[in-house]
Each structure stands twice: as structure tokens, then as C-alpha cells.
Amino acid sequence: MNERKIGILLSYLNIALHAIVGFLYVPILLHYIGKSEYGLYQLIGSLIAYFSIMDFGLTAAVTRFYTKYKALKDKVGMENILAISLYGYGGATALSLLVGIVCYWNLDGIFGASMTVGELLEARQMFLLLLFNIAVSLSTMVFRSVINAHEKFLFLKGLETVQLILQPALVILILQKYPTAMAVAVAQTALNVGLILARMYYCFAWLHISIRFHYWNQELFHDFKKLALSVFVVTLIDQVFWKTNQIILGIVRGTAAVAVYSIASLIYMNYMALSTAISGVYLPHITEMVAQRRPIEDLSSLFIQIGRWQYYLLALVATGFIIFGKQFIHLWAGNGFEDSYWITILIILPFTIDLIQNIGLAILQAMNRYDFRAKIYLLTGVLNLVLAIPLGIKFGGIGCAVATGFSMLMGNGIVMNYFYKKYIGLDIPAFWKQIGQITISVGLCLLIGYGLDRMLPGSGKIAFLCKIFGYTVLYGVIVYGIAMKSEEKEKVQGIARKFRRNG
């Protein structure tokens, strides 16, 4: 099994672990630190997350150009691009610290109206610690890019598995004595520093990388800057979508509203990870395809093929959440989080369009055409911000979700599909024809599943798990029998045979 397949499998293992740990972890956090402290932790985390984008797209650019030189067996180019990127990361780290200090001195003015004196004091302490965490991460991000470019996904994803298991265990251990949001931040920072040291050791001891400045290439710098800034703009707008709504709610509604929105956020971020688990390991492969000048038909075929598999999985989760989501949130988070269901629905449905097409983003990066995505995403983010503020004031979290869902539908859906077809040459009509055919089976599953849920008695945890299992089997049978192509069925059968042999 090659590293790419291992990377995909480990990504899904990590998603499952993240979901399981998260769904167990959040009630434990709420139990130890309470709703307000949890909301405070999410609020400061949302604010500090903006500093993580200050790599200015360097990570994606390093992966792309390092992979290109690696494919061409240009050792000097590989060493040179790492040296240049380290200067960039150093500047990004310094800038993030400068901006962070300015924000720190203005925290009282931003949140003074919605926080108590005690909450503000703890918020300042958490902000400084998490700012340090971000600075350490930014200055060493190049090592993650190198491991990704070498497609060493067993190590890269394995570290993520370790983090998923150790972090909640460490947090719970600390909360026994110090039940505060600050204690959670301390545990996260300590573990993050340890993992960074492990990645650095792997790069030098196992990959034997060398970082050395050889020459200045103006054309390379122009291409590098174009991709890096494009990725930076997209990452910035990602923060608008996924973090700004919580900050708006923190200002106009307080920490309790942030906690409700954060429950929905945890669900739709796990939903997003189901898609990016596949596309995230394909950038080096697609970069090699583009470098080898493979025809656009090959890229279009890959775009449709991966999109179908992503849709099979995402449609299962989306329809399952529509049917069972209210009961799930009640069993998981308890009372007071009813709006989280509608917030999640309003976001994941339009978001699905973008998620089943995110191989297209890797294609744009490999072609260095990502600047259009950045421009459209910028306009989409502005639209989201303009809509989210008044809707958040009037309707709370649901209003913010409406703004985000509508903005994604317009920008990530309609406009990006036009660009893929018109300027990249991907066969978008064929893509949507195939997705439409699958949707017939998905709709049938939704109707049958909803009817069975209404008819079958039981609302406890055991009954809930049985319904989830039953719906998953129903979905699998219908989609396999009606929607899947023969070659897709053969892949499923091949996986089943491997499981039987291993069993």
C-alpha cells in the first residue's frame, strides 16, 4: 500500500478519532469548566485563530515548489526554496507577534461590554499563551510542508493520531486540579511544542533535508508570491467563515451564544474533514501530473472520480444529521443547544458543493491559478461579513449561519463552477450530471430513513445508536445497488475481501 493510500486511511482514522474524542470531550469540558468558561475558551480560540493565517500562504507554496524541484531531481532548487521560505516564515512570525501585542492591549475595549472582570483577566492570560503557541507553530511550519511534499503520510498523520489521543487525556488530567479554560490552553500548547520538535527531528534525521541559500530567482519569486498570497487570501476568508461569526456573537450576544454556535462549529468542521481527508493528500500527486503536462481530461476524470466518493460519504452524514441531528445534540451537549441543529443544517448543505469539488482547489494550486479562487473568496467573505453582522444582531447564531450559507452557495458554488468550466476546462456538466444521478438514491434514503425514525419507538442512547447503524446499512445498500458504477463496486468488493482475509 502506497503512502497516499495510507495517508487517506489514517486521515479517516483521525477523523473518526476526532469525532469520537470531540463528542466525548465537549461534555467533559462543559462538566468541569461550565458553559461560560467553555464559551470563553472558544471565543479566545476563535480570535487567536486569525494569527494562524499569518504564514501568508507559504505552506502551500513551499509544498508545491518543493514537490516540483523534487520531481525534477533538482537538489539545489530544493535546498534553495527551503532557505527562502525560512526568511518568509521569520517575517510572518514577527508580524504575528506585533499584531498580537496590539490586540492584547485592546481586549478590554473589544469584550468589556460582554465579559465580567474575571473573564477579561483570564482572556488576557489565554491570549498571550495561545499567541506564543501560534508563533512557535508559524516559525517551524516549513517542516510540515517538507514531510507532506515527500508524501510521508504515515509519520505526518500518525503524529496527528498521537495528538488526538494525548491532548484530551492531558487536558482531563490537568482539569482534575485546575478546572479552568486556561488549563486547557496550557495543555494544548505543551503538546504542540512536543510535536513540532518531533517533526523537526524527522526532517533532519530521516529525510536528510538540507536548507541552504544558493541564488535569487526573480521568476521563481514571482510565481511563489502569486501562489502564497492567493492561498493567504483564501485562508483569511476561511477565518471569516469559520471564526468571525463566533466573535460577532461574542460581542453582541455574549459567551453563551458563542458556546451554542461552537457546538455547531464542531460538527460542521468534522463534516469538512471528511472531504479534505482525500483531497489533502493529492496536492503532490496533482503537481506532478501538471509538471508532466498530462492532458486536462485526466485531471477532469480525477476531479469527477474523487468527487463521487466524497459525495457518497458526505451525503450519508448530511442526511443522517437531518434525520437524527436534534436527538444527537440533545444526547451529546444537553439542553440549551437546540439552535445548534439549525445552524449546522444551514451551513453544511451549501458547503457540500465546495467539499465535493475540493480536488479542484489542488488543481488550481498545481497550475498556479489559485489567484481567481482568492478573488472570488474575498468577495464572498465580504458578503458574509456584511450579512452576518445585522443578521447576528437580530437573529443570533441562526442569522450568522444564514449569512455564511448563502455566501458559500453564491461564491463557492455558482461562481467557482463557472470558472472551473470556462477557464480550467474541467467537465463540470458531466460532474453535476453524475452527482444528480447519485442524489436520486440519496433522496430515497432520506425519505425512508425519516419515515422509519418517526415510526420506530425509543429515544435513549441505545435506541439512537441502533437507528444510526440501521440507517447507515440502509444507505449503503441503496447507494451500492442503485448509484455506484461497476468499477466503484469492484473497489468496495476489494476492500471487503481484504477485511475478510485480515479477519
Where are these regions (language model features)?
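Membrane-interface junctions at transmembrane-helix termini in multi-pass inner-membrane proteins
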Residues: 4-5, 134-160, 172, 179-182, ...
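Interfacial segments at transmembrane-helix termini and the short loops linking adjacent helices
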Residues: 35, 104-129, 321-352, 424
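Transmembrane helical elements of multi-pass membrane transporters/channels
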Residues: 6-22, 187-199, 203, 218-288, ...
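Helix-loop junctions and terminal segments of transmembrane helices
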Residues: 56-72, 149, 207-208, 264, ...
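Signature of the first transmembrane helix
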Residues: 3-68, 96-103, 133, 167-168, ...
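Membrane-interface helix-loop junctions in multi-pass transport and translocation proteins
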Residues: 28-32, 36-37, 154, 165-197, ...
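Interhelical loop/hinge segments that connect adjacent transmembrane helices in multipass membrane
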Residues: 1-4, 121, 181-182, 199-242, ...
